[in-house]
Amino acid sequence: MREEVIRIERYNPCHRREWDEFVETAKNSSFLHRRAYMDYHSHRFADYSLMAYQGERLVALLPANREGNVLYSHRGLTYGGWIMPLRHFNVVVMLQVMDAAVSYLKADGISEMEYRAMPHIYHSYPAEEDLYALFRHGAELTVSNVSTTIDLRCPLHFNTGAKSSVACARKNGVVVAESDRWADYWQILSQLLKERYDATPVHSLEEMQLLKSRFPEQIRLYAAEKDGELLGGIVIYSIGGVLHSQYTAATPQGWQYRVIPAIYQYIIANAGKDSRYLDFGISNEDRGRYLNEGLVLQKCGMGGRAIVYNTYKITLR
């Protein structure tokens, strides 16, 4: 009997339960793909997420948004890419899914897809079927950002510089712990981004507090204090088996006391027990063409090594 052809549908709110149930059991999904996370910024991104069916069976999801005639996967998330099930799915089905999606997008006036591939550390089981499908559709690599990651199963030791930073923090009476001082931290973060980059955090304080209330176990703030004064902190997203550093900031005194390595050491020792990787995040600007070498060296000094976040462009002909 011939397999049924792939059918593409756009996500709408009536699909919410079906979407979330698929995310729960997929081999490369996380809380980032739950609608309770994706929909918090629906006012910023015109959702154009796709659902691929084989007959009546849902076989893949693509979190995505549309801007003009371009489809992005997804600009409001840490990374993009097709979400795939563990069973009854393979590269042959992925090729059929991509073919069907391209036909669907072309019919709706979309001429380009920007596909932000998911780094392999976020897979709970091998899930690179999409990369081969991109190749088959002539995808062009347009962005390559370097992140720095620790394998928490066998972490490398901090180098002399990082150890010295931790010792400095301890010598100055800095205490590190999980914190609920989100408002104080957001003030530090906002001031830092304004002074260094004339920018603001991607999330407002209200948005982050909302997400924290929805995902209390997956979103945590680890902070350094001295005599009750908040000196710095790191917001960690627990994404499957990965601890991802979402925000890092400190006060001038916090930098002087070198609190950031001390916080990371605490995270590795305490929060990292049930995770496989700690991902420090990317160190690039200008779509990967500029590498902040000093920042990379600091992360490598804490035991991190490189992975890449790649983005591809498909011209839909």
Task: State what each model feature region is.
Residues 13, 31, 92-95, 202, ...:
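Conserved phosphate-coordination/catalytic loops
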Residues 5-55, 59-70, 119-254:
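A conserved beta-strand-loop-helix scaffold within acyl/acetyltransferase catalytic domains
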Residues 77-124:
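A gly/proline- and charged-residue-enriched helix-loop-helix capping module
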Residues 22, 104, 270:
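Short alpha-helical functional segments enriched in proximate histidine and acidic residues
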Residues 75-83, 186-191:
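Short, basic/glycine-rich phosphate-binding loops at helix/coil junctions
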Residues 115, 144, 179, 280-281, ...:
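Residue-level detector of family-conserved "landmark" positions at structurally sensitive sites
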Residues 53, 61-62, 77, 85-88, ...:
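Aromatic (often tryptophan-rich) hydrophobic motifs at membrane interfaces
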Residues 45-47, 107-110, 219, 273-276:
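Short, high-confidence coil segments that cap the C-terminus of an alpha-helix
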